[in-house]
Amino acid sequence: MTMFKTTFRQTATIAVSLISLLVSPMLWANTNNTIEEQLSTLEKYSQGRLGVALINTEDNSQITYRGEERFAMASTSKVMAVAAVLKESEKQAGLLDKNITIKKSDLVAYSPITEKHLVTGMSLAQLSAATLQYSDNTAMNKILDYLGGPAKVTQFARSINDVTYRLDRKEPELNTAIHGDPRDTTSPIAMAKSLQALTLGDALGQSQRQQLVTWLKGNTTGDHSIKAGLPKHWIVGDKTGSGDYGTTNDIAVIWPKNHAPLILVVYFTQQEQDAKYRKDIIVKATEIVTKEISNSPQTK
């Protein structure tokens, strides 16, 4: 019995040491390593596939990791769908006030807002807010129905010079995130450039752009994702996403103190279909790519 206890204790010590060796590289963000090396270490630790794109609008410099590779968007795809509605509202006064009927048969999994409006219906503005701020899946589907289907969102993406984004399915099917499946995917850098164009550029009219930014700033699902990896006084507008294979995503517009805005996209997926979500990886990737700016005296 004594021998077993000693052996168990030694084994446990060795196990803890090995875990420390694996975990500590993720926690230290060694300044002697390049950002790419730090992200690579994080990816190896996570045993998944990580995609990152950061655009610093102060000088338009970029940091990317697997930036050109395709990743399942999951609910981050919703930003483009809502933007497509906003674009149409530029030509149709009062469009956002248009009431959309919601039937019980329309409801799909995770619809915390739309399920409360089966009698009254919701305006396109309300559906857009529910889509972005609560990731309501039925709201997304009603927006897609109004636009004419997922292909219309892809068409809108092309109109703002995004040749990578593609939306093929509705909720919840768009979240299957099967490895190698190009459906409902984009690349981190393509999404970052589109998010920049939509929120800071001229892809939308001024009032539509301001509305999109307001909705993103009011997101309720992002407190433990990109936002958690940033100084608390920075302003963030984001859209999270999750799906099969532990797909864990977040895309954000970030306003650091005394600094031009940042655009950050972090996509992450894993090998097992039922893998757990890893918001900790999103947080750590955020810390790595924004460390230089967050440590600057002017942004503190």
Curated annotation (Swiss-Prot):
Catalytic activity reported: a beta-lactam + H2O = a substituted beta-amino acid
Single biological process term from Gene Ontology: beta-lactam antibiotic catabolic process
Effect after changing V23A: In strain: 5E78-1
Consequence when changing K257E: In strain: 5E78-1
EC number of this enzyme: 3.5.2.6
Signal peptide: 1-29
PROSITE patterns documented for this protein: BETA_LACTAMASE_A (PS00146)
Residues noted as binding substrate in the record, renumbered to the chain: K239, T240, G241
Group of enzyme by EC: hydrolase
Coiled coil regions, renumbered to chain: none
GO MF term set: beta-lactamase activity
Active site: S75 (acyl-ester intermediate)
Source superkingdom: Bacteria
Keywords linked to the UniProt accession: Antibiotic resistance, Hydrolase, Signal
InterPro entries: Beta-lactam/transpept-like (IPR012338), Beta-lactam_cat (IPR045155), Beta-lactam_class-A (IPR000871), Beta-lactam_class-A_AS (IPR023650)
Impact after mutating E88A: In strain: 5E78-1
Pfam entry (one): Beta-lactamase2
Effect on the protein upon substituting S123T: In strain: 5E78-1
Family: Belongs to the class-A beta-lactamase family.
Described function: Hydrolyzes broad-spectrum beta-lactam antibiotics. Active against cephalosporins such as cefuroxime and cefotaxime.
Summary of subunit composition and partner proteins: Monomer.
Note: The class A beta-lactamase family has a specific amino-acid numbering system, sometimes called Ambler or ABL numbering and often misspelt as Amber. A multiple sequence alignment was used to derive a consensus sequence and then the consensus was numbered taking into account insertions and deletions. This allows use of identical numbers, e.g. for active site residues, despite differences in protein length. UniProt always uses natural numbering of residues, hence there appear to be differences in numbering between this entry and some papers.
Protein name: Beta-lactamase
Source species of the chain: Proteus vulgaris
